[in-house]
């Protein structure tokens, strides 16, 4: 860290400030996302949800976090101590690292690299390692089964996500996420690529281990899944990582299909609203869909999950990629 100040001086300080300015709001937004999820679930189930800590219960998540920090991290007998403790840290670190290439507005991105989508795919595919490490190092059959399920599930649906992204790239001609947003000035990709938008969102549910695809932590079958043996802040890091990944996948959905920071129509007064506000509103919409699905759709069986990924999404995505490429070539619509 000292070399940063020596070699780069003020630019080094700016880099650190940018990282903190991104990480702190994400961590705080996780707390409010948990509160919002519990409130929405309460309304859907005809009850109040959190309502005691702070006005309207808005401080409930912070109270839960303080309680969790005070809990002891118990390491099971026979567990691999180093890997057991490294797994939640790896999961949380990867969930935050992926945000480096997400554009919040025009020019508002930490690293505007030309291979931003490849970077996101690479980072998101590493997330399975933290879960496998947790399952194996816990020395528990329930945690191990949860880790195996997660590995199969995430690998299966990353294939579909990759094919969906290829379809978007065919329409854009660039791997830069800012270019993807700029290409949607005329029409959001969610309209012409509606089936791929649906596949991407459902695959995002599976990628983040959210209902109805929360089999790696299926409480009715595996106690708590891969984090059965975790407690205290080690469990808290897994919890933070899961919700940070939810926000990340919502941001990716917004960038790839909902026009990122662009307004629905480029007319007044919609274009008076700053781009980052539109981006945050679209993320909130996607997060509401996450919660809505959790409240209304029952958990899939494992064979149904695999069948959906390999026998439905994979062939359909392949056909749609070929169809999109054919239409672009036939009508000479390939991006220049």
UniProtKB/Swiss-Prot annotation:
Top-tier EC class: translocase
Localization terms from the record: Cell inner membrane
Keywords carried by this UniProt record: Cell inner membrane, Cell membrane, Membrane, NAD, Quinone, Translocase, Transmembrane, Transmembrane helix, Ubiquinone
Signal sequence extent: none
Classification via PROSITE patterns: COMPLEX1_ND1_1, COMPLEX1_ND1_2
Catalyzed reaction equations: a quinone + NADH + 5 H(+)(in) = a quinol + NAD(+) + 4 H(+)(out)
InterPro entries recorded: NADH_UbQ_OxRdtase_su1/FPO (IPR001694), NADH_UbQ_OxRdtase_su1_CS (IPR018086)
EC number: 7.1.1.-
GO biological process assignments: aerobic respiration
Listed transmembrane segments: 14-34, 82-102, 115-135, 161-181, 186-206, 247-267, 273-293, 312-332
One GO cellular component term: plasma membrane
Topology class, membrane: Multi-pass membrane protein
An example molecular function term from Gene Ontology annotations: oxidoreductase activity, acting on NAD(P)H, quinone or similar compound as acceptor
PANTHER family, A to Z: NADH DEHYDROGENASE SUBUNIT 1, NADH-UBIQUINONE OXIDOREDUCTASE CHAIN 1
Oligomeric form and interacting partners: NDH-1 is composed of 14 different subunits. Subunits NuoA, H, J, K, L, M, N constitute the membrane sector of the complex.
Protein's job: NDH-1 shuttles electrons from NADH, via FMN and iron-sulfur (Fe-S) centers, to quinones in the respiratory chain. The immediate electron acceptor for the enzyme in this species is believed to be ubiquinone. Couples the redox reaction to proton translocation (for every two electrons transferred, four hydrogen ions are translocated across the cytoplasmic membrane), and thus conserves the redox energy in a proton gradient. This subunit may bind ubiquinone.
Family: Belongs to the complex I subunit 1 family.
Protein name: NADH-quinone oxidoreductase subunit H
Organism whose genome encodes this protein: Rhodospirillum centenum (strain ATCC 51521 / SW)
Upper classification of the organism: Bacteria, Pseudomonadati, Pseudomonadota, Alphaproteobacteria, Rhodospirillales
Gene: nuoH
């Amino acid at each position: 860290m000292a070399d940063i100040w020596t070699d780069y001086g003020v630019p080094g300080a700016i880099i650190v400030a940018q990282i903190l300015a991104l990480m702190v709001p994400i961590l705080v937004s996780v707390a409010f996302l948990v509160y919002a999820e519990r409130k929405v679930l309460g309304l859907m189930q005809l009850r109040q949800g959190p309502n005691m800590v702070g006005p309207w219960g808005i401080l409930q998540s912070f109270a839960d976090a303080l309680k969790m920090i005070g809990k002891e991290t118990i390491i099971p007998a026979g567990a691999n101590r180093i890997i057991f403790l490294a797994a939640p840290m790896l999961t949380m670190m990867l969930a935050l690292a992926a945000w480096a290439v997400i554009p919040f507005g025009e020019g508002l991105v930490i690293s505007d690299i030309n291979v931003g989508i490849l970077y996101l795919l690479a980072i998101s595919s590493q997330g399975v390692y933290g879960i496998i490490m947790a399952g194996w190092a816990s020395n528990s059959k329930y945690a191990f089964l949860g880790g195996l399920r997660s590995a199969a599930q995430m690998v299966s649906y990353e294939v579909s996500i990759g094919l969906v992204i290829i379809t978007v790239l065919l329409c854009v001609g660039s791997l830069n996420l800012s270019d993807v947003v700029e290409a949607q000035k005329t029409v959001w990709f969610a309209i012409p690529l509606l089936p791929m938008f649906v596949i991407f969102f459902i695959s995002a549910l599976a990628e983040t281990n959210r209902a109805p695809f929360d089999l790696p932590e299926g409480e009715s079958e595996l106690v708590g899944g891969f984090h059965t043996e975790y407690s205290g802040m080690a469990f808290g890091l897994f919890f933070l990582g899961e919700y940070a990944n939810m926000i990340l996948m919502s941001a990716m959905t917004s960038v790839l299909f909902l026009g990122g920071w662009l307004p629905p129509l480029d007319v007044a007064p919609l274009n008076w609203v700053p781009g980052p506000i539109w981006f945050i509103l679209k993320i909130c919409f996607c997060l509401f869909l996450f919660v809505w699905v959790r409240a209304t759709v029952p958990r899939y069986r494992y064979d149904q999950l695999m069948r959906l990924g390999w026998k439905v999404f994979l062939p359909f995505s392949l056909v749609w990629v070929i169809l999109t490429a054919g239409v672009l070539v036939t009508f000479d619509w390939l991006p220049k």
